[in-house]
Amino acid sequence: IHVDVMDGIFVPGRTMPFKEMRKIYKYTSKRLDVHLMVEDASKLITKYANLNAEYITIHVESENVEQNLKLIKKYAIKAGIAINPETKVKELVPYLPLVDLILVMSVEPGKGGQAFLPKTKNKIKEISKLIQEHKSNGPVMEMKR
């Protein structure tokens, strides 16, 4: 189950509070794929790790990226990193050894109903090349719109 978590600061939208998510989650045994679109992910990583997350994805544009990726790994959860449409691909390089998933945003995060941004197709090609250059077993890439 993919869960978007938005704080209204990092992105304009907000999602339900964690305590509400916890209530809903008790009705399923499915593992979560958590996408944290928040300024400070460290506050939420532990909470979602304890909610049976399989993946937790943070943004390369957020705070304390390396520290937060290591925290995700500490819980034996697959770590993902998302990149916004306007962010340069080279920003991912320092984190490639720490991630299992790269999420390419094909819209501006935090708003629904947007049209696909065609320029993100080139970003996928760039990231694929980057993975080949910097890491033998690259992370999985997915696109979100």
Question: Can you annotate each of these PLM segments?
Answer:
Residues K43-L44, A53-V140:
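Conserved anion-binding
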Residues H2-L71:
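N-terminal active-site wall of soluble small-molecule enzyme domains
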Residues E142-R145:
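Glycine-rich beta-strand-to-loop/alpha-helix junction loops that act as flexible
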